[in-house]
């Protein structure tokens, strides 16, 4: 199994060598289509997503060295300023913690900064023109389309073979995280598609719906229309957080 993920990392590395934005597109596919239970053990005790983010970070540093990206440009970007402001609020929230000790909170925040705050900063820094933005949007669209079609497919066949296999493979490392591939709520069969848990998928789907529906209204393209329809269906069959 590790060989497959090494191939994914290798592809990401090659894409980043060409342009960092290509690696960011690879991260989009990985975040949406590969559950976060996938680890790089025994090579390293980190998730596949963290490995991809690390590669992107290396090449973003390269872009800074060769002035393809400037610190002034990053700091002056309104979107990145908002992210940094949010990061400062998270740091201040440590003072309000009641359940965890200080060292644990720092560890959780460090992981959150790496996996959730750094990627959007890297994406914004890597987009240099409209073509880059369209490429990233197309990657999101394709990933959402695959994710929603597969989610509908799992409900039709009554099982989630992809997630079941990954849960079975990583059970020794994440036995507490294993959940049924399909669940039932109020008599409705629900699924989590390519996400580890339906809660995560349920959080993702409304955001995906807003994005694809907005661009359908903007472009009137049939691909956006079908993705909007599939996303709408999945919001109902997820049964969690939607």
Label for each model-derived stretch:
Residues 1-92, 104, 131, 138, ...:
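Transmembrane signal-anchor hairpin modules in multi-pass inner-membrane enzymes, especially those
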Residues 22, 34-45, 117-124, 149-154, ...:
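Juxtamembrane membrane-interface segments at transmembrane alpha-helix termini
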Residues 30, 62, 97, 123-128, ...:
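Membrane-water interface at transmembrane helix exits
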Residues 50-51, 81, 85-88, 102-125, ...:
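Aromatic-anchored transmembrane helix interface
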